[in-house]
């Protein structure tokens, strides 16, 4: 870094420090002052901002967008496409060619004359730089645009009060300082906010502080703290609501939040994944080969030919030919094309590099709801303790579901819908929302597994209404409502209740219990401690019908090597019944209580043969996923609830749906627009196709370059002249690379996508060693035929190159040598293109190419066009300018059998490789 850049960096760092200090002061003011003062300072009220206030706040404080990765400017993207080690080599070659082919002849230096002036080489090299750079720029721009469009399809929203207490749902990016936001379980905190009102609000700040335990947030004014994260009345962007609900006012947005300052401080290029590291490792292996080969070729050519300048030019050309300059572009194009294809299958990719992991999944862990079932919950029965339909049970359930302000799940919606359907037939259900007012609420959490609302009617009677999982409800009930009124909840009554519930579970119903307590008298605010001595009044039986497509989807996943495991919080009986209905064979089932008594080693053994895990907590789901990964599996977890977020983060790839809670979407790598296993199966197939085409190019490039090394080394040592001019090698390399650009659109054999594919960089090395040298055999054969047969026969009248000096002299000798070399170079030029290009069709499939497996039309068209262009060049004026001599017809009588033999040998080696290693790609 120079002095000017250093000064700029120091100034920018100082500016960021000043900005962060200002934000800290704003947060400190909000935390340590009464709510009234905070609202006044932010120029807002509890009624929310009006449009003018929103505009003013946005103009003053900016948008709520966080800089996760710095987007490159057009200039930087152009520089990235044109300025890299590969184009640097080309520029170096262009400079040297300018000096030797233009400057020296112009100045008549080192024996050159003005007649030797030639700008063709320089023009071709610069044209190649332009074409390759432009191609890479266009493809990378398209990839970036495709990724942005896909991400734009995923919307994360928040609920705010605006314009006279009207609640509206807005995109999180549109949030401004002073907005009044409403938070509930499952929400991501949309900005740095000051809590105004909260009910049992617990927030996870693990992403900011590393603290795993949720922290309770309250609206109470705080004393000054050493660290802003210690304030219990401030919730920060990047954290999420674990349980409870709250109203808050936005203090800081976007990059000015604590999370934003951390994200922008480390923003830059995307972090390398294991896949990108593997691709880079292959690139560096090839570059190291090149770095070893180029000096060898340079010294051998210089010593044997005596022309060190030509040797230097040839060495640089070899460097270009052996370097996989198109690899980054091909990989990027494959990923972008895969992402677009997956979007057509209702699958949105948040991170392009996760596509490879998606195709590698061999175990899919998923919740039952919405996956095995239709995610259309219907309240079938509202039963009293005797098992009879009872309107009073439905009425209490409605009061609980309607007035709760946390995450509204499908069962709450089913209760409200059922009440609205039956209110016309039963006057006791009319106008419940108007006849009662909410007093308080104890939100749901996954430890208690129940939710409580406190309501009051117009006569002043207060009721605490609680609903939740049956066992957890029984633990807080001491009475039950029977025929003769309220009775103690004896063991006999408890057994009768559990039997009724078991019968419903066996039929596939999900059952919740409902209880109430009249005129409760809490000490202070209502809390969990008040959930006691309640009266059980009945239960609610819900049906979530199984999906008709589930059985086919699970079979399709199994046919593609993916084992489905169910990880659910529901009880075992309901889960077993649903699995039976959809045709999912349950070999073994483990409950959350079983996991608590198992060591990691015991669970690792049991998990392999267990198809269903039931009654799991969120942490237990994450533990199962982690254990399966430690067993060597690539694990995907599909979920949409707050209880799934931990497991999604623990998985190799998290999968969610567009309707999921914020924290689930934030944790996901892949988002489905439709929660269906069949959609997921199609996405996995697209992931495998994408990986297949990437690994094809990587192995093609590696093996082809490795074979070329042997050919060039032998030619440098044995021939009295260069086997190809530097410009020939560069031009050949460009046309070959252009013919490979269609590989992302190639067909993939059904057998390849039938099972998971893990990225394995080590397989590239073995493939390179097995397949690469094959082409060298036929290169050597071409050397022999061109040097000893075709050139003497059609150029020098039967005289070999080394004997020309004995038969010719002066200008005649120079002309004859140029003709001899021109035909030799044309012969190897054409043979190289044929062998190098046709091997694409050999390597792309373990089957017989053109017969059992055909490449896509774009691949076939580009490769054949490349062959045709380079075959014709020696017969054109352009070829003459390059120094080529037209090839005789007899050459093609040799070339065609030679290439056919090459294809036969390559196919045989390919079969042997598959027998030895089990697979080709």
Where do the PLM segments sit?
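Non-lumenal N-terminal regulatory segments of integral membrane proteins
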Residues: 1-167, 173-176, 181-189, 194-202, ...
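Soluble-to-membrane junctions at the N-terminal ends of transmembrane alpha-helices
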Residues: 63-95, 144, 159, 165-167, ...
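Membrane-embedded transport module
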Residues: 297, 328, 337, 582, ...
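Cytosolic catalytic regions of ATP/NTP-dependent phosphoryl-transfer enzymes
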Residues: 234-242, 357-535, 542, 555, ...
């Amino acid at each position: 870094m120079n002095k000017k850049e250093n000064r700029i960096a120091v100034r920018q760092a100082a500016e960021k420090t000043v900005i962060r200090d200002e934000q800290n002061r704003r947060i400190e003011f909000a935390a340590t002052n009464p709510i009234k003062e905070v609202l006044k300072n932010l120029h807002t009220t509890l009624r929310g901002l009006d449009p003018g206030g929103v505009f003013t706040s946005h103009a003053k404080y900016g948008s709520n967008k966080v800089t996760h990765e710095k987007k490159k400017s057009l200039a930087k993207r152009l520089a990235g496409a044109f300025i890299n080690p590969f184009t640097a080599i080309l520029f170096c070659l262009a400079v040297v060619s300018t000096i030797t082919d233009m400057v020296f002849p112009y100045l008549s230096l080192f024996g050159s004359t003005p007649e030797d002036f030639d700008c063709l080489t320089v023009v071709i090299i610069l044209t190649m730089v332009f074409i390759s750079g432009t191609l890479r720029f266009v493809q990378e721009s398209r990839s970036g645009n495709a990724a942005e469009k896909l991400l734009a399809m995923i919307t994360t929203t928040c609920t705010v009060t605006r314009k006279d207490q009207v609640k509206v749902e807005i995109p999180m990016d549109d949030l401004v300082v002073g907005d009044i936001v409403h938070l509930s379980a499952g929400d991501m905190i949309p900005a740095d906010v000051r809590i105004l009102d909260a009910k049992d609000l617990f927030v996870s700040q693990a992403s900011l502080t590393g603290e795993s335990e949720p922290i309770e947030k309250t609206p109470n004014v705080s004393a000054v703290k050493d660290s802003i994260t210690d304030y219990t009345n401030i919730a920060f962007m990047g954290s999420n609501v674990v349980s409870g609900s709250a109203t808050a006012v936005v203090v800081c947005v976007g990059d000015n939040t604590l999370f934003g300052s951390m994200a922008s401080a480390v923003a830059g290029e995307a972090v390398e994944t294991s896949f990108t590291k593997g691709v880079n490792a292959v690139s560096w292996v090839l570059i190291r080969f090149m770095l070893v080969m180029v000096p060898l070729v340079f010294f051998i050519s210089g010593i044997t030919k005596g022309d060190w300048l030509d040797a230097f030019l040839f060495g640089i050309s070899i460097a270009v030919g052996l370097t996989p300059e198109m690899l980054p572009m091909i990989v990027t194009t494959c990923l972008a094309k895969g992402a677009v294809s997956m979007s057509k299958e209702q699958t949105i990719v948040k991170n392009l590099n996760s596509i490879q992991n998606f195709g590698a999944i061999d175990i899919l862990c998923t919740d039952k709801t919405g996956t095995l079932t239709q995610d259309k919950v219907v309240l079938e029965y509202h039963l009293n303790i005797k098992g009879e339909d009872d309107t009073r049970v439905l009425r209490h359930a409605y009061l609980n579901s309607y007035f709760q302000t946390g995450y509204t799940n499908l069962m709450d919606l089913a209760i409200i819908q059922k009440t609205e359907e039956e209110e016309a037939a039963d006057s006791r259900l009319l106008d419940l929302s108007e006849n009662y007012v909410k007093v308080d609420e104890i939100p749901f959490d996954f430890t208690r597994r129940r939710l409580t609302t406190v309501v009051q009617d117009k006569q002043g009677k207060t009721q605490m209404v609680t609903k939740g999982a049956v066992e957890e409800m029984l633990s807080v009930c001491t009475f039950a409502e029977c025929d003769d009124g309220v009775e103690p909840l004896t063991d006999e009554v408890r057994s009768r209740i559990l039997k009724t519930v078991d019968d419903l579970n066996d039929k596939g119903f999900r059952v919740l219990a409902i209880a109430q307590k009249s005129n409760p008298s809490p000490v202070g605010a209502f809390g969990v401690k008040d959930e006691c001595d309640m009266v059980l009044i009945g239960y609610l039986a819900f049906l979530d019908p199984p999906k008709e497509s589930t059985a086919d989807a699970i079979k399709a996943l199994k046919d593609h090597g993916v084992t489905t495991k169910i990880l659910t919080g529901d009880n075992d009986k309901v889960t077993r019944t649903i699995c039976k209905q959809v045709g999912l064979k349950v070999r073994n089932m483990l409950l959350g209580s079983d996991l608590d008594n198992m060591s990691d080693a015991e669970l690792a053994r049991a998990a392999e043969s267990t198809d269903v895990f039931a009654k799991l907590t969120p942490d237990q789901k994450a533990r199962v996923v982690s254990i399966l990964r430690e067993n060597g599996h690539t694990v995907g977890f599909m979920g949409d609830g707050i209880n799934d977020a931990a497991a999604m983060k623990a998985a190799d790839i998290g999968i969610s749906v567009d309707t999921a809670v914020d924290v689930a979407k934030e944790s996901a790598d892949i988002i489905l627009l439709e929660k269906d296993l069949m959609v997921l199966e199609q996405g996995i197939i697209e992931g495998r196709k994408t990986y297949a085409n990437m690994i094809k190019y990587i192995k093609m490039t590696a093996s082809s370059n490795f074979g070329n090394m042997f050919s060039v080394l032998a030619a440098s040592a044995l021939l009295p002249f260069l086997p190809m001019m530097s410009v020939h090698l560069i031009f050949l390399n460009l046309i070959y690379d252009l013919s490979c650009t269609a590989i992302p659109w190639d067909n993939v054999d059904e057998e390849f996508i039938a099972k998971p594919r893990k990225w394995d960089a080590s397989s590239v090395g073995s493939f390179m060693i097995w397949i690469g040298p094959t082409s060298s055999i036929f290169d050597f054969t071409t050397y022999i035929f061109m040097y000893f047969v075709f050139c003497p026969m059609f150029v020098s009248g039967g005289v070999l190159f080394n004997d020309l000096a004995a038969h010719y002299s002066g200008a005649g000798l120079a002309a004859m040598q140029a003709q001899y070399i021109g035909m030799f170079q044309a012969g190897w030029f054409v043979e190289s293109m044929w062998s190098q290009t046709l091997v694409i069709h050999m390597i792309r499939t373990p089957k017989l190419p053109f017969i059992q497996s055909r490449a896509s039309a774009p691949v076939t068209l580009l490769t054949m066009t490349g062959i045709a262009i380079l075959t014709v060049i020696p017969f054109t004026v352009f070829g003459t300018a390059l120094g080529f001599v037209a090839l005789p017809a007899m050459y093609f009588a040799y070339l065609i059998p030679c290439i056919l033999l090459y294809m036969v040998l390559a196919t045989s080696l390919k079969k042997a490789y598959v027998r030895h290693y089990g697979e080709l790609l």
